[in-house]
From Swiss-Prot:
Thermal profile of function: Optimum temperature is 50 degrees Celsius.
Activity regulation, free text: Strongly inhibited by hydroxylamine. Modestly inhibited by EDTA.
Organism annotation: Delftia sp. (strain HT23)
Annotated protein name in UniProt: D-threo-3-hydroxyaspartate dehydratase
pH profile: Optimum pH is 8.5.
Amino acid sequence: MQDTLLTLDTPAAVIDLDRMQRNIARMQQRMDAQGVRLRPHVKTSKSVPVAAAQRAAGASGITVSTLKEAEQFFAAGTTDILYAVSMAPHRLPQALQLRRRGCDLKLIVDSVAAAQAIAAFGREQGEAFEVWIEIDTDGHRSGVGADDTPLLLAIGRTLHDGGMRLGGVLTHAGSSYELDTPEALQALAERERAGCVQAAEALRAAGLPCPVVSVGSTPTALAASRLDGVTEVRAGVYVFFDLVMRNIGVCAAEDVALSVLATVIGHQADKGWAIVDAGWMAMSRDRGTARQKQDFGYGQVCDLQGRVMPGFVLTGANQEHGILARADGAAEADIATRFPLGTRLRILPNHACATGAQFPAYQALAADGSVQTWERLHGW
């Protein structure tokens, strides 16, 4: 018998396929209009069918955050893979085996020490790894400062002179998650673009190759007014979107394709609470919206059709219990009448990547109400 939202066990991670396809089309059309290729970051879904939908729409290659992801997607037929986390030396043998099996795996570095480790291992094994240099364009995380030309060139020469393939530069404007106006997002997108292009030009001026200029975050990808000098964009969460993205202003709640199916399992009527079987083990501990203009607690409550129920959120969560209540703190007069025992609801997540990671599989919901199980990768 074909499952539906009424027959699935709860909690379950549900993908609204219509919403997902619209999100994919929106980003792909924007990148096509800008004349750059889209290399989606599959750490959001970690699911082969989701990545296949992105590829079918025109995406080229993928970005991963673990070598386990690289293994899975390579086994499923993807060869062009960027491992976008600085390479730890103990992972080099695994990276080597992937390349020896035909995976066009790219590595990244942001230090001379890491470049030396890759070059030494590569020479020892007779493997010319393709390596990109990570650029820090917003002070958010890792990377060589966009203005630190001496360090940039030292890394580039270590790789190039060590027999490795210097493939390009990349950056990620992660601070875009802290913004919420079109003007601020557009300004950061330009800073991201300009800083990465500047680094590429510095390498080229020094006689070093730099064919790829890769930028990306979902907010800046959707906000960029121009991408001159950029060859590709990496974005990930756009495939599902989430409440953090809604607060940033790059999507509406109605665009969020991932939700957690939950069941009402009890009430605390005097407090105006309904209790659901989706606690933080289902929603994750991510409270990203707490720092934004609208706090959605542990998630926005929707009805079974995915329609937002204004004013109701998960205000709290224990391991397996979610507390459904009014966001304004007022006690709902008759919570048990509004949300009877056994009621099924869908909860939109703060952070799609974190919520997806709580589940071994997605339930892919088609327009006709049927559901298919899509496996999801777990762990490292």
